[in-house]
């Protein structure tokens, strides 16, 4: 039951940077003992608001009220000492220090200038035990997993007696088990009466955790949902982007050309039975299946990331021998991989380099000198045409959002002579607005005659974008559905593992 008095209130918050109005008149309330989700597209203002709350930024207008008192923090340390902690996606810890030292950094117990390590480890151990973590406080942080690092960040907040804890995309680098543990801890913190702010693009997380959801759009407050029994995915999407869910996908019937890609009894590691399918020029075929269905494994095999062990791949009726990615690229088949950060981009290189890295071999001068003029023009062209949001082509790609990283990968392949594109989870970790832009790029590629084969575990996405849906189950094709006839019940029925009829 919602309390009558909010513990945290934002009152008319505005924030202006030179030439940019990031927030305008943001007002809403948060209550103790609740998880309050913040949702919106990239650039909607969520992170800016958290930075105001944590003392990184001062508001241009408005105020933050905590437990009835108007607060103003000069920096993050002042906010933390006042009980406000932000757990960012990029964790702010020191790998070479111990767990205990990280938890009490800035307030190490000491006497006469000498740290009392016995007391330090004891106090840190209590915080870790509070979180259900069996970790030696004297362990150097660098030996722990990312999920354990996150628990140390939370312990650090609890050591300051934080009453307000905000999580900014906390699950982006976690395993399924670590996510379950994080959710357990968040629910415990809620029971203790803390205010939990939670920022995520993942709808399933929002619905699993939240007691209330506030939506932002273009730096403005849109709506707060407080009755979680009455809110659904479609209502959230409409609030976030200002259009109906059907408009997000934007599928239209189209005509197709000749067969462009054909798999004839193809097998690869993780693909249990031979796979045969065809994709025509201008056709979008979606691969859907549950975890372990073999979608990603098939994609990797087709691109040469793993070895095809049987069967034949044809492009434009010509057999293609694919033993490594360069063979696939030479044949006109490109891949946007599932793990974008590990396999799709070179994080410490620029947007320009990431776009040009594949095609630059065709444009070198004298066989060995990079053609800077071509590279600048090519990168700028794709940044404009794909609406890649970046300060410039020389910006490190790791500083871009997931959606803009994905568009840069697409720009890379648009620089090649593309016949087939393989898209493996192309919108995972991307906000709704950026998804819409990715879908439009997919449609544009199809209109140019490219054969599109895309794998996704997001069933509404597959049903909304694909002309034809191929359902995989346990490494084999379980069935096909046409766009106009497909629904979630049919697709899930095909995707579910078979139940043995044997009687013990």
UniProtKB/Swiss-Prot annotation:
Q: Which UniProt keywords apply?
A: ATP-binding, Cell inner membrane, Cell membrane, Membrane, Nucleotide-binding, Repeat, Sugar transport, Translocase, Transport
Domain of life, per the record?
Answer: Bacteria
Q: How does it sit in the membrane?
A: Peripheral membrane protein
Q: Which reaction does it catalyse?
A: L-arabinose(out) + ATP + H2O = L-arabinose(in) + ADP + phosphate + H(+)
| UniProt domain ABC transporter: residue ranges | 8-243, 256-499
Class of the enzyme per the UniProt entry, highest EC level: translocase
Q: What is its EC number?
A: 7.5.2.12
Pfam families for this protein: ABC_tran
Provide the function of this protein.
Answer: Part of the ABC transporter complex AraFGH involved in arabinose import. Responsible for energy coupling to the transport system.
> Which protein are we looking at?
Arabinose import ATP-binding protein AraG
Species of the source: Shigella boydii serotype 4 (strain Sb227)
């Amino acid at each position: 039951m919602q309390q009558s008095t909010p513990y945290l209130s934002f009152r008319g918050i505005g924030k202006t940077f030179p030439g940019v109005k990031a927030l305008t008149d943001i007002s809403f309330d948060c209550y103790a003992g609740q998880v309050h989700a913040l949702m919106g597209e990239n650039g909607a203002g969520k992170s800016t608001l958290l930075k105001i709350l944590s003392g990184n930024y001062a508001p241009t207008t408005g105020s933050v009220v905590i437990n009835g008192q108007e607060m103003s923090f000069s920096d993050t340390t002042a906010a933390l000492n006042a009980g406000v902690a932000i757990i960012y996606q990029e964790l702010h810890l020191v790998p070479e220090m111990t767990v205990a030292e990280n938890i009490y950094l800035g307030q190490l117990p000491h006497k006469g200038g000498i740290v009392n390590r016995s007391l330090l480890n004891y106090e840190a151990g209590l915080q870790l035990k509070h979180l259900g973590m069996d970790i030696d406080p004297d362990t150097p942080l660098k030996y722990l997993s990312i999920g354990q690092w996150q628990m140390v960040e939370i312990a650090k907040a609890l050591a300051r007696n934080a009453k307000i804890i905000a999580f900014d995309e906390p699950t982006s680098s976690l395993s399924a088990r670590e996510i379950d543990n994080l959710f357990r801890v968040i629910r415990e913190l809620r029971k203790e009466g803390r205010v939990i702010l939670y920022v995520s693009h993942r709808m399933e997380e929002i619905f699993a955790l939240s007691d209330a959801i506030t939506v932002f759009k273009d730096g403005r407050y849109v709506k707060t949902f407080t009755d979680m029994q009455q809110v659904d995915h479609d209502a959230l999407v409409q609030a976030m982007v200002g259009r109906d869910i059907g408009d997000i996908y934007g599928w239209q019937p189209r005509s197709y050309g000749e067969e462009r890609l054909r798999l004839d009894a193809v097998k690869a590691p993780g693909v249990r039975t031979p796979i045969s399918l065809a994709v025509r020029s201008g056709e979008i075929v979606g691969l859907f299946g549950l975890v372990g269905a073999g979608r990603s494994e098939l994609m990797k095999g087709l691109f040469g990331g793993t070895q095809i062990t049987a069967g034949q791949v044809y492009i434009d009726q010509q057999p293609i021998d694919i033993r490594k990615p360069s063979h696939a690229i030479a044949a006109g088949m490109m891949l946007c991989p599932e793990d974008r950060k590990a396999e799709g981009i070179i994080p410490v290189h620029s947007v320009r380099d990431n776009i040009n890295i594949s095609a630059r071999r065709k444009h070198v001068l004298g066989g060995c000198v990079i053609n800077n003029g071509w590279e600048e023009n090519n990168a700028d062209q794709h940044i404009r045409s794909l609406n890649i949001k970046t300060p410039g082509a020389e910006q490190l790609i790791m500083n871009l959002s997931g959606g803009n990283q994905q568009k840069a990968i697409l720009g890379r392949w648009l620089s090649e002579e593309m016949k087939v594109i393989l898209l493996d989870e192309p919108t995972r970790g991307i906000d709704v607005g950026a998804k819409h832009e990715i879908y439009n790029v997919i449609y544009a590629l199809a209109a140019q005659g490219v054969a599109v084969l895309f794998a996704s575990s997001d069933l509404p996405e597959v049903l909304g974008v694909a002309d034809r849906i191929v359902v995989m189950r346990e490494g084999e094709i379980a069935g096909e559905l046409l766009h106009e006839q497909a629904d979630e019940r049919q697709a899930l029925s095909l995707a579910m593992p078979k139940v043995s009829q044997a009687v013990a």
